[in-house]
């Protein structure tokens, strides 16, 4: 069934609090700036020092109540990125991570969720925080379509984020049922090398670091890794999902959930993601001016 609204799942629940504090009033007060076919499905992230964290190292100085007040004010679902792949039973007693889950579980308004990798954690959250929905993390690196399909069929998960390399296997995606399509959340702006063979190891090192293990940072194996993340480079990825792709291919096919990555990047770049995916081109300058751009700003 063709979808009429695309929902974006945005990075930086804690990491980019100040950005959303400035952006969300514009989202509410100037809907004419925004494409009329899109909305915010959730904002995801984790603060620093969360042993359940994964994907990226969390950051941000704002407390959970402050963050949840902002999300509640705008009726937006909050998601904790707790996608550590190496959790053991003894880690489940962590006070900070449990307190965060309790805050989201007890929050009134929009339902909130947790992005998970570990089945141990998934079972624990279902038992102790039943109001939270679960999202299967892309850190599972499910590159085989049948493995991904089995994940989609699991009743535990409200959403499943496939590996980005499955973004455009349209001959298989089109065969999903409407219920299955509603669960799929595509990662749009991945800059990782399409041929990467070390992605799972990259995520595992982050999991170890979040657990406090002393291990070196992952060394990226991409041919051009020295340039870091560039949005222009991500756009050249063969499985990059553009605004046109969303409107002309995915929504007509029945898909409506799209994840924007960027927790480990700078807020200026995340703003560019928001502008590209949500704001009509003629209004992008207005949003920049509302947030940071004035007639006295120097860059040199």
Where do the language-model regions lie?
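Active-site pocket-lining/capping segments in soluble small-molecule metabolic enzymes
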Residues: 1-151, 157-300
